[in-house]
Design a protein with these regions (language model features):
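An extracytoplasmic/periplasmic, membrane-proximal ligand-sensing/linker region
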Residues: 32-34, 177, 244, 266-327
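Short coil/turn segments
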Residues: 42-44, 98-99, 127, 135-140, ...
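Hinge/capping helix and adjacent helix->loop/strand transition within the periplasmic-binding protein
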Residues: 85-91, 106-193, 242, 255-288
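Short beta-strand->loop
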Residues: 114-124, 160, 182-186, 204-205, ...
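N-terminal (or domain-start) structured segment
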Residues: 26-117, 155-156, 164, 181-204, ...
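N-terminal export leaders
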Residues: 5-12
Length: 327
């Protein structure tokens, strides 16, 4: 009996010892299948553009490939929730932004995911400022003049957005709240129809991402009043920041980056962060991001988490104080 039991233990020990190299080998082989990046917006927008720029380059390192999967619905809620509930194995990532990880936290009382608890930042790749543009015949030379008129004439000035709860809506509503003025909100189904009416003179002002706004400003069809970043935009060097106008101590930049579901193993997180930093800082990727009007960031791990927490602390209370609603 003792001999049999001893033989059994020896065999079991040999089996376990033999399994260890296989486990190490499996870890070293990560990734051994394609990684998918969930984009919670349709193709063609900022989410999709940045996700594909990074995926194209990262896929050259991770030979099974990096595949972008657009999962839309309820703004950015459906795709983001899907990523939060995905297996935490390093094979599903989220294209995260201020929109789905910060602004949604202030907009929705019962958000189905927690931006901090449900995700681990891989890295932030780029940020874009917003530009406040006005119809070219609006009789104000700067933002301070517009605000002074709006104070004396409540709801006489109108502002467009790309929809209720969009980044354009929240930034504008927060600005008017801090400035103590009332403007009439005109929500559209996307930015393009907002531009059509703005250029046509049927609405007065509109906040949009600076790269898109620049096209219309450079064409002379609209004029720029302010940018939302911490510093002036290289695309509009003569246009002041919101802080510089003296109207409100407000700033917002829309950053984009990759996030993994919480509890993703440390080994996979470290590999992803190491390779993503190399991708973001590669000359060709930086060139593509800068030509699209972005400011490359290359903030990984705790650096990215600090930005997320900072913006949550800034914007969630402000959205609630301003009474901004998603509908």
């Amino acid at each position: 009996m003792h001999s049999s039991r001893r033989t059994h233990l020896i065999l079991l020990g040999a089996m376990l010892a033999g399994a260890l190299p296989l486990r190490v080998l499996a870890q070293d082989a990560y990734p051994n299948r394609a990684i998918r990046v969930i984009v919670p917006q349709p193709p063609g927008g900022g989410f999709d553009f940045v996700a594909r720029v990074l995926a194209d380059k990262l896929g050259q390192v991770f030979k099974p490939g990096v595949v972008v999967e657009n999962r839309t619905g309820s703004g950015t809620l459906v795709g983001t929730d899907l990523a939060a509930k995905a297996p935490a194995d390093g094979y599903t990532l989220l294209m995260g932004s201020v929109s789905n990880l910060v602004l949604n936290a202030g907009l929705y009382k019962n958000l189905s995911y927690d931006p901090v608890k449900d995700f681990e930042p891989i890295g932030l790749a780029v940020s874009y400022s917003y530009t406040l543009v006005a119809r070219k015949d609006l009789p104000f030379g700067n933002l301070a003049e517009l605000v002074a008129y709006a104070k004396a004439n409540p709801n006489k000035v109108s502002y467009a957005s790309a929809g209720n709860g969009s980044g354009q809506h929240i930034l504008a509503a927060a600005l008017w709240h801090l400035a103590g003025v009332l403007l009439t909100h005109v929500p559209y189904r996307g930015a393009q129809p907002a531009y059509t009416d703005l250029i046509g003179g049927r609405v007065d002002v509109f906040f949009d991402l600076s790269p898109t706004a620049r096209t219309h400003v450079d064409a002379g069809s609209l004029k720029a009043l302010a940018v939302s970043g911490a510093s002036r935009s290289p695309m509009h060097p003569s246009v002041p920041t919101l802080r510089e106008t003296g109207v409100a101590p407000l700033e917002l930049e829309s950053w984009f980056g990759y996030f993994a579901p919480a509890r993703t193993p440390a080994a996979e997180l470290n590999r992803l962060r190491t390779e993503l930093r190399k991708v973001i800082t590669s000359p060709d990727v930086m060139d593509r991001l800068e030509k699209a009007g972005g400011k490359p960031l290359a903030l990984v791990g705790d650096e990215a988490k600090a930005v997320l927490r900072r913006d949550l602390d800034r914007w969630v209370p402000l959205i609630k104080a301003a009474g901004i609603q998603p509908e």
